From Swiss-Prot:
Belongs to the threonine synthase family. GO terms for molecular function: pyridoxal phosphate binding; threonine synthase activity. Its cofactor is pyridoxal 5'-phosphate. It comes from Methanosarcina acetivorans (strain ATCC 35395 / DSM 2834 / JCM 12185 / C2A). The modification N6-(pyridoxal phosphate)lysine is found at K104. This is Threonine synthase. The N-terminal 41 amino acids are required for activity. Pyridoxal 5'-phosphate binds at N130, G231, N232, A233, G234, N235, T369. Its EC number is 4.2.3.1. Keywords: Amino-acid biosynthesis, Lyase, Pyridoxal phosphate, Threonine biosynthesis. GO terms for biological process: cysteine biosynthetic process; threonine biosynthetic process. It catalyses: O-phospho-L-homoserine + H2O = L-threonine + phosphate.
Length: 405
């Protein structure tokens, strides 16, 4: 059994209500379970392959899920990258290997299923790209209309293409992501349209399965630290909740330090952590090459600050140049192709190791959130162009070896 509870004033709400924030104080909501009633079959947990719905007993859904086989993403042991950064043990959890190419699939399989369960037959979101792509695809699978609002000219074309091809109504607004989110929240409050941004607590329940899977894939041992990119701040919150729930249920016995990485041009959470402020100061004009985390007023900031502080973690910002260098390292040292925002985790890890904040003997998991093909234009912009040669073997040899045979 479960219900919703405000993290600010403690007001409680029925699971049958269509509600996104507290009606009394506008605080964020969390899904609260009766853990004493949840019985986990450890033998089944240890033998069944990871996927979102493997953990159905810890998800707030009663009906058949809308699924395209999300989850079960690889956890790569990255020895060459670890050596370059200077730590002993590094893993990369590559969420870009989900069906739509990002971690958002985990939230949307639960969120769209919940929409149907609540009798909502149209869904909507604002997006920097990945959310719109995932919602369009899960909406198509469910057979319901999808509306997405994007900041005009600020979204990678690979992500826009996904939303368009899968039939979403795509609106490019003259404004940034935060403007789009404010508008879609107003729309969903006035119409019978279900909001599936990460302010929706049910969506985050799907994303917490990343934490479940990491523990699962490490034989239920918890890493010392999770390092991940932070945009709207739902993922760092959700993953920490996943680890907390496994500990509550006695499946694991410790918690990782949650470490959030933001781009220098868009880092309100980093500034709040470093200053000790109880809340963020929104940034009006966030800018970074990492479009997926170009968010100046993250809606889950309160939850994220709590997760970082409670876990003994930290937050750090990185430059666009550091992000793009890490993107190349992931690809060229480990064969892991990610979009720029994903690489922020590795860029941040490198910086924090160099600063002495992260110990070289720590076991670290970096989350990479989206696939390389989400934003191919950035790759083309920062990599060397293909070498054009004549169609003969001597020209080929000269291009490769510097001389003809």
């Amino acid at each position: 059994m479960y219900h919703l509870k405000c993290i600010e004033c403690g007001a409680e709400y029925s699971r049958d209500e269509v509600i996104y924030t507290c009606s009394k104080c506008d605080g964020l909501l969390d899904v609260i379970y009766d853990y004493s009633s949840i019985k986990i079959d450890m033998e089944k947990l240890k033998t069944e392959c990871p996927s979102v719905w493997k953990y159905a007993k810890l998800l707030p859904v009663e009906r058949e899920p809308v699924t395209i086989q999300e989850g079960g993403t690889p956890l790569y042991k990255c020895d060459r990258l670890a050596e370059k950064i200077g730590i002993k043990k590094l893993y990369v959890k590559h969420e870009g290997m989900n069906p739509t190419g990002s971690f958002k699939d985990r939230g949307m399989t639960v969120g769209v299923t919940k929409a149907l369960e609540l009798g909502m037959n149209t869904v909507a979101c604002a997006s920097t790209g990945n959310t719109s792509a995932a919602l369009a695809i899960y909406g198509a699978k469910a057979g319901i209309p999808v509306v997405v609002l994007l900041p005009a000219g600020k979204v990678a074309l690979g992500k826009v293409a996904q939303a368009l091809m899968h039939g979403a109504k795509v609106l490019s607004i003259r404004g940034n992501f935060d403007d789009a989110l404010a508008l879609v929240r107003t729309l969903c409050s006035q119409e019978k349209i279900y909001l599936l941004n990460s302010i929706n607590p049910y969506r985050l329940e799907g994303q917490k399965t990343i934490g479940f899977e990491i523990a699962d894939q490490l034989d239920f041992k918890v890493p010392d630290r999770i390092v991940l990119p932070v945009g709207n701040a739902g993922n760092i919150t959700a993953i920490y909740k996943g680890f907390r729930e496994f500990k509550i249920l006695g499946i694991t016995d410790s918690l990782p330090k949650m470490t959030g990485i933001q781009a220098e041009g868009s880092c309100p959470i980093v500034k709040a952590i470093k200053s000790g402020a109880p809340a963020i100061t929104p940034e009006e004009n966030p800018e970074t090459v990492a479009t997926a985390i170009r968010i100046g007023n993250p809606v889950n900031a309160t939850k994220a600050l709590s997760a970082i502080r409670e876990s003994g973690g930290t937050a750090e910002s990185v430059t666009d140049e550091e992000i793009l260098a890490a993107q190349k390292d992931l690809a060229r040292l480990e064969g892991i192709g990610v979009e720029p925002a994903s690489a922020a985790s590795v860029a941040g890890l490198r910086k924090l190791v160099d600063m002495g904040v992260i110990g070289r003997d720590e076991t670290v998991v970096c989350i990479t959130t989206g696939h390389l093909l989400k934003d191919p234009q950035t790759v083309i912009d920062v990599c060397e162009e293909p070498t054009v040669v004549d169609a003969n073997i001597d020209a080929i040899r000269e291009a490769i070896f510097g001389k003809a045979k």
